[in-house]
């Protein structure tokens, strides 16, 4: 059986690194730059980058409303760092005109751990990820300030939620694609398969 076809929003961020991790996790990665391509994938990854820039690019490429519709229709989506911000219902510390896709009942704080100079690495126990702790790379990372009752917190740093899941949506404040460890991607790919989206 071939793996699920997972799109990677290819407007900014670590597209190649996500593709490598998805392949290792048993998926078939494909770049997504146009709304018509959303109908051809079983799930989608929103990479990191600069969330306000990505939001503007979503409007330029006419992807914002199609992405909102896809999330509302149940498309499994995994957002890392800026991807977590885009999936949030609200953002603290962001621009008032920040375009959001939404879907996760969370409020996130941009650059919660500080600016670029305050980037750090940590080892996290992530619910649903077997084996040793996950090596997590945080770069100008957000954290979750508030989470609704339907949101499952999978990992924390200093009591702040940094990995959350709600239905078919998964988000991390860190960059799992940068470490060579595909277990977080496998968690997402497995959820795509179990949702019935995987072919």
From Swiss-Prot:
L-glutamine binds at residues 49-51, 110, 139-140. SUPFAM superfamilies: Class I glutamine amidotransferase-like. The keyword Hydrolase applies. Pathway: Cofactor biosynthesis; pyridoxal 5'-phosphate biosynthesis. Its EC number is 4.3.3.6, 3.5.1.2. GO terms for cellular component: cytosol; glutaminase complex. It catalyses: aldehydo-D-ribose 5-phosphate + D-glyceraldehyde 3-phosphate + L-glutamine = pyridoxal 5'-phosphate + L-glutamate + phosphate + 3 H2O + H(+); L-glutamine + H2O = L-glutamate + NH4(+). One of its GO terms (biological process) is pyridoxine metabolic process. The active site is at residues 81, 175, 177. This is Pyridoxal 5'-phosphate synthase subunit PdxT. It comes from Frankia casuarinae (strain DSM 45818 / CECT 9043 / HFP020203 / CcI3). The gene is pdxT.
């Amino acid at each position: 059986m071939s793996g699920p076809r997972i799109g990677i929003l290819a407007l900014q961020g670590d597209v190649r690194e996500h593709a490598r991790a998805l392949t290792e996790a048993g998926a078939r990665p494909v770049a997504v730059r146009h709304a018509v391509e959303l109908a051809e994938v079983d799930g989608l990854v929103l990479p990191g980058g600069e969330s306000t820039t990505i939001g503007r690019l979503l409007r330029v490429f006419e992807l914002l409303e199609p992405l909102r519709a896809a999330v509302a229709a149940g498309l499994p989506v995994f957002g890392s760092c800026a991807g977590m911000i885009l999936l949030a219902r609200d953002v603290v510390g962001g621009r008032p005109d920040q375009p959001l896709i939404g879907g996760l009942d969370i409020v996130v704080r941009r650059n919660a751990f500080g600016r670029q100079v305050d980037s750090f690495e940590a080892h996290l126990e992530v619910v649903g990820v077997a084996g040793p702790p996950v090596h997590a790379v945080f770069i100008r990372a957000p954290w979750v300030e508030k989470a609704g009752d339907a949101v499952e917190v999978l990992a924390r740093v200093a009591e702040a939620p940094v990995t959350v899941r709600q239905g078919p949506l998964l988000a991390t404040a860190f960059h799992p694609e940068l470490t060579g460890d595909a277990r977080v991607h496998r968690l997402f790919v497995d959820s795509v398969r179990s949702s019935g989206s995987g072919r």
